[in-house]
Amino acid sequence: MSVTRVILLGALFGGGLAVGAAQDAELKPPPEDTLYTLPPVVVTATQARERSTPVTFSNLTARNIRERYSVQDIPVLLSELPSMTTTSENGNGIGYNYINLRGFDQRRLSIMINGVPQNDPEDHNVYWIDFPDLLASTDNIQVQRGAGSAFYGPPAIGGSINLVTNPFSATPSIMVESVLGIQEYGDSLKGRPLATRKVAVTVNSGIVGQRYLMYGRLGRITSDGYRVNSSVDLSSYFLGAMRIDRSMITRVHFFGGPIHDGLAYYGIPKWMGSDPHLRRSNWSDLSADSLAVSYTSRARRIALGSDTTYAVPRREEEVETFSQPHAELIHEWRISPRVTLHNTLFYYAGDGSFTYDASWADSAMLRIGTSYGFPAEENPRNALVQAFVGNRQVGWLPRVEIDHGDGDLTLGAELRFHRSTHWGKIAYAENLPEDFDPGYHFYEYNGVRDIVSLYAHEIHRLADGWNVMASLQLAYNRYGIRDEKYLGTTFSVPYLFLNPRVGVNVNATESLSAYLSVAYTSREPRMRNLYAAEDSWFGATPQFAADTSGGTVRYDFGSPLARPEHLLDVELGGRFTGRDAGLTLCLFWMDFRDELVRNGQVDIFGQPVTGNAGRTRHYGIEAEGIVTLAEGFTLGGNATVSRNRLVRYTVYDDGGSPVVLDGNPIAGFPDLLANLRLTYRNAWLTGSLVWKYVGAFPTDNTDDPRFRNDACRVWN
């Protein structure tokens, strides 16, 4: 997609208006006070630093973000970092997008904004679409790989990502931004329409009353999407205020935006990808004999030919509307030169629904009948289901940092409480009973999630360039379901984990350093692994040990079938930093017990179905480097070579016979990834040529070459 951006800048000086470039400047409170700069929001215990912290990480700076961001979602911007891959539901990187890090999907990552957890407490997923245009207000992004030292949010299995927003400026300014994008479909039926539009207005107050700063940004992004009926309409806002006192800094952030998007969560068969028209297809459901189809000569026959069992096109009514405002209060108090107290309070409230095709559902599934108060003589036809979710989450993240001379000690805690309401109703159907109540909820339940953790983190400085890190986290969390309509399922499942981490960093010279870290991390399964209550109307049941004697099912809610994951992660790395070049190397060894792996199936919403594997292992090498080729020209890149294998994993076929998969590659994990970026930069212009390679990877665990995603290469 080609993008053109036009920016109008206005800097306000003494009530006049001059055209100029907005720039950051040092903030000078009253003359008798100390000189302040505008500090970013950094969670010190989780933010890694070169030559100090023994952690494998990469940073995207404010300049990187400004140069590369236009309209794309956060995962697309991050996709060039080491071991990172991105997928897009609607095909153009605007809408629902997902990140994989070292092959681990984003449910296994710990995602934070200003240190505040963003993973959904029940599903563990991250809905980047709920943060439209947030990158325009972001100052820094750090990605830690492996068992990242993120003490807030879910334990980091594959890694952690922290976005830091710091949009304030001491210089008053107004900026109006417009972006136009031309979509290349490769389909003669569509041509090259103007498919993406963005408009945004940014206001910085500068210094007000010698100690206050205010910031506001309003925007809107619209896109037709690449796939059929996959458009998005994303409004956004980010409002912030800061007060700086002699020993305190207080910030308030309020951000989010209502969204409206067409559903595109169901994928296409691999063999459709070679046809420029069919690969834009957006099906609600599809069944086909993909193994019998030639990828080229017969691809166009899928819509009409014998290779399709059935295909249900996505209906225009299948859309989502959602809004999740985020409110944060971030306070820093420097009690003494050696002691600083940090407190973060936050509140999220998300409400919305999506409407999807349920033409396959009968009266029994939709709970229509005499026993439900609606006598039905025939099944509904062409049903559309509206699924609603309402979330409320409040949290407090306190921590104290102590400089005790030989090191820095951080003590902190996390308290989060999440409550949710879920229900479904029939948005439309033919042949409904005459007295049918359109507000009738055929499923409904409330979710509960409580999270409490304590941690201690020490970076101890030894003699001559040696730093030792030791961390310990005690994490308690509890899942629960209450007030389930019709089935009456109620349970509460607690988890308690102790997550230690140790490491050492040594600075051999001014240019060369090395590190070693060892971490043990445990993580609970997500709610759907225990009970997909929103799917109970078409057959989902609680996944707990059950007693079926006497013909009645009695669940033991103290014995969930899905087990927590346990990871031992060892990272050995080195960094070289020169005047014109830099290089980082990392060897990693990740040994799992009970890893939740994909089994090759997807649910009705296109999401992978997972289950525990007894023992798995991931190991490999990562390299990241940059070199200045000539004045203005730089070449940067990274590569990952890894091996991801099932060590002990047995499944059972339909007849109940065991199938041993020991030694097979793990679904969803490519063994080879690479990125290159050639950049030219001067005072007025920045341009880049980008190449990305993603190696082939299996889509299930059988090691059958027919079930693989082919390797791909992309130039931008």
List PLM regions with ranges:
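Extracytoplasmic beta-strand/coil segments of soluble accessory domains associated
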Residues: P75-P117, D139
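Transmembrane beta-barrel wall of Gram-negative outer-membrane proteins
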Residues: R192-Y266, W271-D275, A327-P337
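Gram-negative outer-membrane beta-barrel transporters
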Residues: D464, G582, C586-R593, V609-T702
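Face-selective signature of the C-terminal outer-membrane beta-barrel domain
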Residues: T321-E484, N505-T509, F576, A581-W589, ...
